[in-house]
Amino acid sequence: MLNLRVIAPNRIVWNSEVREIILSTNNGQMGILPNHAPLLTALDIGVMKIRIDERWSNMALMGGFATIDNNQITILVNEAEKSSEIDPEEAQETFQKAQANLTRAEGKRKTIEAHLAFKRAKARLEAINVTQE
């Protein structure tokens, strides 16, 4: 088993044992199983999949870092939401607004900000859509 802790600036989002996780890193998806080699990695905005026994749970992570050592996983994130905490209607509305803002963005700074908002909205939507499959 792995001991997973997800820590945001204002709260501990997750603190329990899990069987496996799949992270969105800056280099792509990464699966973590028990006895994984020690690792420090940057996390991209995306969905983390968590396997508890035979069921999976999802969490939208808004970037951060993960450390893995001796079956202890500590994830420090800017923000995180469990799929059960996300309102599907609000997530869909936010995604549509972010998509529209991205197409209208002008200038480098506005485009970067719009792209980050789009990635955050997409991660939240993916976290709940994966759950509903």
From Swiss-Prot:
Q: What GO molecular function annotations does the UniProt record carry, in alphabetical order?
A: ATP binding; proton-transporting ATP synthase activity, rotational mechanism
Q: Which InterPro entries match?
A: ATP_synth_F1_dsu/esu, ATP_synth_F1_dsu/esu_N, ATP_synth_F1_esu_C, ATPsynth_dsu/esu_N
In terms of superkingdom, the source organism counts as: Eukaryota
List, alphabetically, the SUPFAM superfamilies matched: Epsilon subunit of F1F0-ATP synthase N-terminal domain (SSF51344)
Q: Which Gene3D superfamilies match?
A: 6.10.140.480, F0F1 ATP synthase delta/epsilon subunit, N-terminal
Pull one GO CC term from this UniProt entry: chloroplast thylakoid membrane
Q: Enumerate the UniProt keywords alphabetically.
A: ATP synthesis, CF(1), Chloroplast, Hydrogen ion transport, Ion transport, Membrane, Plastid, Thylakoid, Transport
Q: Primary place of residence?
A: plastid
What is the annotated localization of this protein? Answer: Plastid, Chloroplast thylakoid membrane
Q: What topology does the record note for this protein and the membrane?
A: Peripheral membrane protein
Q: What does this protein do?
A: Produces ATP from ADP in the presence of a proton gradient across the membrane.
Protein family according to the UniProt entry: Belongs to the ATPase epsilon chain family.
Quaternary context: F-type ATPases have 2 components, CF(1) - the catalytic core - and CF(0) - the membrane proton channel. CF(1) has five subunits: alpha(3), beta(3), gamma(1), delta(1), epsilon(1). CF(0) has three main subunits: a, b and c.
The name this protein carries in UniProt is ATP synthase epsilon chain, chloroplastic
Q: What is the lineage of its organism?
A: Eukaryota, Viridiplantae, Streptophyta, Embryophyta, Tracheophyta
